[in-house]
Structure formats: structure tokens, C-alpha cells
């Protein structure tokens, strides 16, 4: 499913412990680390896609997490030109994502990376909240900075300001105009709207 602009609808997951540490995983047979993420099916809502991807990539079920909130609207990033398959009928130039913040309420024994026959990850660990912005592949740094910036107030309400902290300089540079990591809808290319500055809370009822 690719939109008319060439972006594939996708969900991203920030799984956080109560102490503010977030789940960080290594892709199978690759050196790259990232948050869980995945494409939406045509018949899914973003929330439904998020729970499916959570189960497929981490083995966790809805009872192992609490949904704290999500980014408002879509956040986009472009794929590097070498990764764009120009010979396909529908050309995908990037992803447009809704990012979710989940509190991990289960036990670490519930985390099973081999839940499916084709696992996405082969190793995981807990890292500081802003660590992923500095260590994810370069073309995703802008969208990671924007997603975590939106979700940080919710994370701080759970873990406390000291645990989550302020956005570090590296993350700030990914967000600022003119940064090579800023992504498709950086402030330089698409003006920020005041109403989109906060993460929205989601009712679990």
C-alpha cells in the first residue's frame, strides 16, 4: 500500500520501561539497530498495525504493554536513492509513519524475537531515551528526532524529567533546518504547526 506521493503507511514503536530506557534491537544479519516498525495493511488502523507489528517483531501481546500516546499525523522519511526500486509498478520513495509510545509492563521473558519464521531482529537491549537518534541509520535520524520530540512529554510524565532528559545536541541537529538527516518534512521543507507540537494521548477504553 503506497500513497500517491510514493510513501508507504507505516507504524513505529517506542517501547519504554518505567525508568525511561527504551527497547533497541539489531536487525537480523545486519549491523543496523532500530526501533520496531512495519507497514500497515489496507484493512488496518494504525493502532491495529502497531499491535500486530509488536507481536511479530518482539513477541509481546497487548497485555504486556500500556499505550501511552502517539504522534499526531504522519511523520515522513525518504529512502536513499539506492534503496528505491524504480522498476516496480508502484515506486516507494519512503515511509510515512505514526509513532507510538508504549510502557513495557510485562516481564523480559515475554520478549521473543523468534516469534515468527522470519524474525526481524536477533538481539536487543535497553538504551537511554535519546540514544537511538544518534545511532540509527543516517536517513532515519530526522524522523527519530521528530518522533521522540513529540513523545518526550509523555515519557517524562512516566519516568520523570531526569530520566528522559532534554533533547541532546545531536538530536537537535537532526531536527533543525538544513540538516542532512532532517528528513522529508523537516521545518525547512514543511513549516511546523503549533497544533502538532504535542503528542496526543490515546484512550485505551
Swiss-Prot record:
Domain Nudix hydrolase: 6-149
Domain of life: Bacteria
Ranges of biased composition (kind: Basic residues): 187-196
Record key words, sorted: Hydrolase
Molecular function per GO: pyrophosphatase activity
Positions of the UniProt region annotated as Disordered: 178-205
Gene3D superfamilies: Nucleoside Triphosphate Pyrophosphohydrolase
Cofactor(s) needed: a divalent metal cation
Keyword Hydrolase found: yes
The protein's enzyme class: hydrolase
Short sequence motif Nudix box: positions: 38-59
Keyword Hydrolase: yes
Enzyme Commission designation: 3.6.1.-
Cross-referenced InterPro entries: NUDIX_hydrolase-like_dom_sf, NUDIX_hydrolase_CS, NUDIX_hydrolase_dom, RppH
Matching NCBIfam families: PRK00714.1-4 (NF001937), PRK00714.1-5 (NF001938)
HAMAP family: Nudix_RppH (MF_00298)
Family: Belongs to the Nudix hydrolase family. RppH subfamily.
Function description: Accelerates the degradation of transcripts by removing pyrophosphate from the 5'-end of triphosphorylated RNA, leading to a more labile monophosphorylated state that can stimulate subsequent ribonuclease cleavage.
Protein name in UniProt: RNA pyrophosphohydrolase
Protein species of origin: Xanthomonas euvesicatoria pv. vesicatoria (strain 85-10) (Xanthomonas campestris pv. vesicatoria)
